[in-house]
């Protein structure tokens, strides 16, 4: 497909959880990775590492751990009962069902990309004590979003997921990610992103209007 207008690509980059088995080219993945690598990071530290999984056996391994993680997570979710209307309830059920589908079929998605970040001291200290300068993953998630928007521009669907962190130890070991000499983890998983051609269509997802969550100059000073 032709390259999309930037705003259209951004506003139609929604979580895709159902994919066809159509192969995804290495060239397209490399394009998305180049876009990811151009994302800004604090102090230009560029902490992320990417693990691209296309091997069917390794995808199956990831699929098993993802499914096990989602099983635990799903059981912990209470069934909401305070929906404002049936449309909101139906939307919640669709998202839940699509997430379940992804958990059961992750191994069938052509490409799985894991975004890793090092476990390192992050912050600064002066004579007054520690300074809160934000979290290291704030320098990783812009790369994830760049990747997803680039994929959208190529007609590929993605979803930013994190539930795999429940079984991060097993997944990192399966991928051969090095640990520290004492056996403690050297990296953690910031995100697992499936990549493939979507079942269905892209579109603008329902969201709160920006005006509802925007305050100008002072809190609650909103514009209609």
What are these regions (language model features)?
Residues 18-19, 49, 157-162:
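Short catalytic-loop micro-motif centered on adjacent basic/acidic residues
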Residues 52-140:
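Glycine/small-residue-rich phosphate/adenosyl-binding loop
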Residues 12, 181-224:
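C-terminal helix-cap and adjacent tail motif
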Residues 5-22:
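Generic N-terminal amphipathic, Lys/Arg-enriched alpha-helix
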């Amino acid at each position: 497909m032709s390259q999309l207008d930037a705003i259209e690509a951004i506003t139609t980059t929604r979580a895709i959880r159902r994919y066809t088995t159509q192969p995804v080219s290495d060239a397209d993945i490399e394009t998305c990775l180049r876009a990811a690598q151009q994302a800004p990071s604090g102090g230009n530290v560029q902490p992320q590492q990417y693990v691209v999984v296309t091997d069917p056996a390794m995808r199956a391994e990831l699929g098993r751990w993802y499914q096990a993680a989602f099983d635990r997570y799903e059981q912990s979710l209470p069934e909401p009962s305070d929906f404002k209307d049936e449309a909101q309830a139906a939307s919640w059920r669709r998202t839940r069902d699509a997430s379940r589908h992804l958990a059961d079929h992750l191994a069938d998605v052509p490409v799985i990309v894991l975004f890793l970040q090092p476990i390192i001291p992050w912050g600064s200290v002066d004579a007054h004590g520690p300074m809160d300068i934000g979290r290291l993953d704030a320098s990783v998630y812009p790369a994830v979003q760049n990747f997803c928007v680039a994929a959208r521009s190529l007609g590929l669907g993605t979803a930013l997921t994190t539930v795999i962190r429940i079984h991060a130890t097993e997944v990192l070991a399966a991928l051969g990610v090095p640990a520290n000499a004492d056996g403690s983890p050297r990296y953690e998983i910031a995100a697992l992103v499936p990549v493939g051609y979507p079942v269905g269509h892209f579109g603008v997802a329902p969201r709160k209007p920006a005006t509802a969550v925007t305050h100008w100059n002072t809190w609650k000073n909103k514009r209609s």
